[in-house]
């Protein structure tokens, strides 16, 4: 998307201090509009927020739970640690763009991912005047929003991305939808045409508030420069409270240019939202859950991304009960994968023993999950023998797909702390003993381990991830694109802790891996960050190689290159008699050639790169990748016939699980 020149008609400053200003409230509306209550209702709401559409977006996958908000909790990160010192005098007028940047500073923002254009260049000019905020310049706005997501997923603090109006703003759409589905706290700021041009089909005008209404937790169109401090404060509060999600702030260019003396003490206007935040968990219900545990013989924990802030409390709960743990794709890392009580991932490509455990259980403890179709398969058959306990921060998720016997709408962390307190008070009295159940599951682990075959000196993709796990001691931050490589990374890397695993779960957005790794490397510069990617996903945002080079980010890219859209090929093999329908990404006129040459992309951006084709050379090649300072790309050539197994077909049940076969067989 080419950056556009500014509109010549919007270059003069507008002063809100002067009643004679051409943009005074007598000529233009001064209200900042939040979105309507519901995307299917056209009646506009009051000008203050009374409701967020938590109940609307029922298909979201968990990213994290939030802190429960109390009256004495500080909203701003900087307020928690030190008094903010402005570079402006208290009564000094400044541009709206400077107010916006200072508002970000006051929220503790130190990094943004921003791509300039005509409608946002005032914000970029203000960023150059900030000594606090660093802009990491992506090479595409989608790269910027995915990087903001990676930052948020890796750090827990809202990621910030900025784009211009029109195509710049619409390039954020996939990232906003992804953040909503995975409950990731990000704040996206877009430039907009001047207020007087809104609705005139002006150059690069897009009604981005309308476009993103159904894929954001909340959004704003700022129509009064004096609203900026409040709007930014609310945006960060909304992004990380309750069920986290993306917030969009659309700022017209004339608002950015107006002079104003900001009021930093404006209160937030969120009465409806505040009243809907989850309350403390009901103690009687917690006691009932403990009683169900004591009465069960085959309990299983089913944990999701909602547990990512509660890892220590979850571990303590498992220690007190001895209940085995199965994780969703988004929940990986909440409980150590290598622990003897871990069943690893369940669902479509989960382990046989995790799915066996859920299928055989008499009590399913579903914490921070949404009973997604990729986990449950056929709903009627999922955990059909079990009583179900569902704890979630979002009331809309409870009973949406699977009706629980006991449910609590609460912060998972507080619920776990309450359960642990009850269990500790009863220690020695409950006499929980699930050893026979654990032994049954251990036998399933022995009988149905994750495994793969080797063919000559070809490199099995699963083996590449195993070696990476060994060489990093399972401590790297891993990002992925979407496809087979994503599932193998979920299966074969042993995640030790939360915020190690960055992947597009609910939306399944290809091109996510490299930008997300950029965000993680910016937010956690002392960690090893590896993008495990597929050739199809990688090339969708390959331009971000320039970003990691220019920023000297030590992002390692391990590319599992089979020159195919591997997951679609797998389905073609299984369900379409191996008929190839545009899934070959190489050069049909020369199939012996590795095409495109990923090493040339890296070379063009000055990123060191190497290719490995033989299994015996793989370990040394990965070690060199890890040892090389700065960014590095390792092109690992793998067979396209490999299938991700186990596999429960879409809409199937545990009895339908597939454990054998690949593209070398016919079906």
Swiss-Prot record:
GO terms for biological process: isoleucine biosynthetic process; L-valine biosynthetic process; response to herbicide. Binds 1 Mg(2+) ion per subunit. Pathway: Amino-acid biosynthesis; L-isoleucine biosynthesis; L-isoleucine from 2-oxobutanoate: step 1/4; Amino-acid biosynthesis; L-valine biosynthesis; L-valine from pyruvate: step 1/4. Mg(2+) binds at residues 535, 562. Pfam families: TPP_enzyme_C, TPP_enzyme_M, TPP_enzyme_N. Thiamine diphosphate binds at residue 141. It comes from the Eukaryota. Residues 484-564 are annotated as: Thiamine pyrophosphate binding. Residues 1-45 are annotated as: Disordered. Keywords: Amino-acid biosynthesis, Branched-chain amino acid biosynthesis, Chloroplast, Disulfide bond, FAD, Flavoprotein, Herbicide resistance, Magnesium, Metal-binding, Plastid, Thiamine pyrophosphate, Transferase, Transit peptide. The keyword Coiled coil does not apply. This is Acetolactate synthase 1, chloroplastic. It comes from Nicotiana tabacum. The gene is ALS SURA.
């Amino acid at each position: 998307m080419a950056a556009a020149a500014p509109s010549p008609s919007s270059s003069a400053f507008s002063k809100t201090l002067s009643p004679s200003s051409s943009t005074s409230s007598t000529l233009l509306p001064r209200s900042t509009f939040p979105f309507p209550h519901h995307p299917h209702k056209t009646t506009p709401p009051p000008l203050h927020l009374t409701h967020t559409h938590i109940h609307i977006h029922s298909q979201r996958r968990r990213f994290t739970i939030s802190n429960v908000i109390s009256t004495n909790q500080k909203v701003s990160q900087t307020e928690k640690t030190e008094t903010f010192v402005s570079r402006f005098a208290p009564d000094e007028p400044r541009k709206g763009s400077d107010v916006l940047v200072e508002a970000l500073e006051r929220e503790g923002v130190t990094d943004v991912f921003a791509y300039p254009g005509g409608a946002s260049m005032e914000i970029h000019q203000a960023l150059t005047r900030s000594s606090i905020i660093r802009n990491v310049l992506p090479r595409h706005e989608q790269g910027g929003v995915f990087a903001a997501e990676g930052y948020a997923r890796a750090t827990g603090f809202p990621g910030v991305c900025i784009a211009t109006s029109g195509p710049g703003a619409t390039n954020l759409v996939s990232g906003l939808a992804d953040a909503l589905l995975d409950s990731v706290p990000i704040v996206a700021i877009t430039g907009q045409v001047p207020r007087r041009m809104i609705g005139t089909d002006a150059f690069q005008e897009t009604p981005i508030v309308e476009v993103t209404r159904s894929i954001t937790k909340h959004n704003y169109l700022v129509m009064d420069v004096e609203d900026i401090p409040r709007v930014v404060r609310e945006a960060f509060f909304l992004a990380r409270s309750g069920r986290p999600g993306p917030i969009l702030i659309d700022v017209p260019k004339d608002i950015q240019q107006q002079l104003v003396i900001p009021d930093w003490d404006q209160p937030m206007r969120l009465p409806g939202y505040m009243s809907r935040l989850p309350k403390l968990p009901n103690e009687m219900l917690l006691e009932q859950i403990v009683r169900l545990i004591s009465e069960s013989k085959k309990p299983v924990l089913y944990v999701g991304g909602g547990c990512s802030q509660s890892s220590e409390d979850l571990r303590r709960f498992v220690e007190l009960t001895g209940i085995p743990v199965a994780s969703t794709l988004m929940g990986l890392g909440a409980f150590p994968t290598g622990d003897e009580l871990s069943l690893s991932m369940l669902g479509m490509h989960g382990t046989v023993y995790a799915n066996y455990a859920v299928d055989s259980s008499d009590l399913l403890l579903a914490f921070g999950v949404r009973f997604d179709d990729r986990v449950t398969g056929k709903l009627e058959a999922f955990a059909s023998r079990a009583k179900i306990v569902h704890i979630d921060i979002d009331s809309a998720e409870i009973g949406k797909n699977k009706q629980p016997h006991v449910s609590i709408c609460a912060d998972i962390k507080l619920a776990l702390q309450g359960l642990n307190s009850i269990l500790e008070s009863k220690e020695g009295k409950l006499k929980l003993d699930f050893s026979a159940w654990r032994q049954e599951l251990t036998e399933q682990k022995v009988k149905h381990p994750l495994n793969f075959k080797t063919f000559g000196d070809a490199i099995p993709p699963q083996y590449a991830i195993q070696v990476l796990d060994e060489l990093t001691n399972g401590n790297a931050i891993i990002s992925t694109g979407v496809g087979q490589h994503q599932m193998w990374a979920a299966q074969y890397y042993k995640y030790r802790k939360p915020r190690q695993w960055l992947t597009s779960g609910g939306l399944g957005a290809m091109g996510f891996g490299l930008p997300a790794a950029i965000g993680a490397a910016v937010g956690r510069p002392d960690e090893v960050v590896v993008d495990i990617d597929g050739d199809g996903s990688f090339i969708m945002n390959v331009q971000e190689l320039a970003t990691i080079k220019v920023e000297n980010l030590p992002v390692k890219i391990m590319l599992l290159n089979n020159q195919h859209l591997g997951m679609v090929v797998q389905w073609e093999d299984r369900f379409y008699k191996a008929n190839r329908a545009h899934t070959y990404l190489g050069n049909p006129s020369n199939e012996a050639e590795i095409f495109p040459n990923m090493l040339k992309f890296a070379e063009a951006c000055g990123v060191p790169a190497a290719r490995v084709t033989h299994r015996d050379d793989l370990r040394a090649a990965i070690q060199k990748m890890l040892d090389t300072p700065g960014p590095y790309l390792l092109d690992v050539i793998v067979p396209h016939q490999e299938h991700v197994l186990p596999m429960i077909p879409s809409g199937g049940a545990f009895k339908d699980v597939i454990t054998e076969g690949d593209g070398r067989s016919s079906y």
